[in-house]
Amino acid sequence: MIISTTSQLEGRPIAEYLGVVSSESVQGINFVRDFFTRFRDFFGGRSQTLESALREAREQATEELMARARQLQADAIVGVDFEISMPSVQGGMVVVFATGTAVRLK
């Protein structure tokens, strides 16, 4: 499965647009580690806990996006976009939304 943030694939003409596919992934952040995340963020360091949660959520959202495109018998997903949200005021979770257009290639 080809995944691209662009609307076209160079050298691979699109034969058919199959529709929009979307997915989401929610990852909890360990509250004990979250304390250290805030401490590190305050002093400008990188938070491995948050980066790991974001990476895992993005990977899960991508896998689900590909599964939904496969259900449509797509060869690729174009125009892929990821949105990240931390809906909890306390920062206890991260949500990644993924959307794109499933296509069949010539």
Curated annotation (Swiss-Prot):
Biological source species: Pseudomonas putida (strain GB-1)
Pfam family, one: YbjQ_1
Name this protein carries in UniProt: UPF0145 protein PputGB1_2909
Coiled-coil annotated spans: none
Top-level taxon of origin: Bacteria
SUPFAM superfamilies found in the cross-reference section: YbjQ-like
InterPro entries for the chain: UPF0145_dom_sf (IPR035439), UPF0145_YbjQ-like (IPR002765)
HAMAP family on file: UPF0145
Family from the record: Belongs to the UPF0145 family.
